[in-house]
From Swiss-Prot:
Any Gene Ontology biological process: catabolic process
Family matches, as InterPro entries: AAA+_ATPase (IPR003593), ACT-like_dom_sf (IPR045865), ACT_dom (IPR002912), Homeodomain-like_sf (IPR009057), HTH_TyrR (IPR030828), P-loop_NTPase (IPR027417), PAS (IPR000014), PAS-like_dom_sf (IPR035965)
Keywords recorded for this protein, A-Z: Activator, Aromatic hydrocarbons catabolism, ATP-binding, Cytoplasm, DNA-binding, Nucleotide-binding, Repressor, Transcription, Transcription regulation
Domain PAS: 78-120
Stretches assigned to the Sigma-54 factor interaction domain: 206-428
Residues engaged in binding ATP: 234-241, 290-299
Protein's name according to its UniProt entry: HTH-type transcriptional regulatory protein TyrR
Function: Dual transcriptional regulator of the TyrR regulon, which includes a number of genes coding for proteins involved in the biosynthesis or transport of the three aromatic amino acids, phenylalanine, tyrosine and tryptophan. These three aromatic amino acids act as effectors which bind to the TyrR protein to form an active regulatory protein. Acts by binding specifically to TyrR boxes in the promoter region of the target genes.
Species: Salmonella typhimurium (strain LT2 / SGSC1412 / ATCC 700720)
ACT domain span: 2-72
Record GO terms (molecular function): ATP binding; ATP hydrolysis activity; cis-regulatory region sequence-specific DNA binding; DNA-binding transcription activator activity
Amino acid sequence: MRLEVFCEDRLGLTRELLDLLVLRSIDLRGIEIDPIGRIYLNFAELEFTDFSSLMAEIRRISGVTDVRTVPWMPSEREHLALSALLEALPEPVLSLDMKSKVEMANPASCQLFAQSQERMRHHTAAQLINGFNFQRWLDGNPQSSHNEHVVINGQNFLMEITPVHLQNENDEYVLTGAVVMLRSTIRMGQQLQNLSTQDLSAFSQIIAVSAKMKHVVEQARKLAMLSAPLLITGDTGTGKDLFAYACHQASPRSAKPYLALNCASIPEDAVESELFGHAPEGKKGFFEQANGGSVLLDEIGEMSPRMQAKLLRFLNDGTFRRVGEDHEIHVDVRVICATQKNLVELVQKGLFREDLYYRLNVLTLNLPPLRDCPQDIMPLTELFVARFADEQGVPRPKLSADLSTVLTRYGWPGNVRQLKNAIYRALTQLEGYELRPQDILLPDYDAATVAVGEDAMEGSLDDITSRFERSVLTQLYRSYPSTRKLAKRLGVSHTAIANKLREYGLSQKKGEE
């Protein structure tokens, strides 16, 4: 029988409660005291009349506000919850003490080693896992999880060993043991395969924290539902292909094929057969294969004038002929085009058909460069760090406090792709458990030079001025890393600079200014 006593924080109250149990000759099996004003009692079953009388007497104790029966003591509830969790885990889990002896093993581990719970407690980790040296791991003063490949009963496992630190009476955290989890590589492969075949809710894979990216994603969600051609523009590495695929996945065509062709990577004479098919070889083209779905034509600005004419005809009525065949084929395909070039300039230079441009420019999605979305940089960094650490089977490193300042100040001419590659390169060569600015190699970047690129003259005068102003501040802030120094350099007030830095998302934490 277990009771939960609600009470005030009064000196001597617990003593009076225990005296009452002694007076009634009740065998107390356990007592637990909660700091928030609850006392839990565990004792043998009582007759109903004795129990009712005891409850009444407890309520008469000064400071007791209520009393009720409960099914478990707090420690019992925690133990049962932990046991249920361990039993539900499909992966074998072991709890080890400081001598590598098994203290606890879940059912999956008992099944793997063909041992009962009791017999498991008579083994050390080294006896169960061939080649595992617990002492060597211990001598390394472990502070975080460690992964290594092990073979058990002919099966391959990724073993993750995590140190367990508990707080002692001096408020110091001391190492008390470890938890070992064994992940079957076959099971992991199946899970990844299943994950890759699922419809990962279209835009859930796109990081959008900044207002600009949120607006683009919201716009893309609306455009995804339409069937008219979609033109996606943006600098290199901004994620045009990712948005194209997301638009397909979010559209009514998601159950149908999605195919992508890079117009710049295929010779001109091969593009036609790739898109429309080749009759002599019995080959179906992209448009025919993707009937009912979507086709991405990446780097559309690189398409030859002859192919531009054929594409325009297809966009007008959805019909085409395979190479070497006169028979017309009609398909229903949504065409998504992507380019990092300024198509208006190409039209003016006679390199891109004006009528095709207007046919493609019905629905347009313009992706901003990463330098214009500084709020997205750290969320993207955290995503890439987690992804690549997991892929490489290494612990996820901590991000140093000053990493954010360095990454958000950099101009990222290669945009998200450059950030992704920089993080990957840093993790492959990282020593230690912290990712610092010096671990990420970034080429020199002149923000002012980029500011006069193809997109610099788009929009109103205010838009153009803002882009140039942000570029100047981005470049100079690296050399004058405080608002006061930068204000002095530019000959304006500290307040004006602070406001501008906040406006463009370039400001550091207050304590760093």
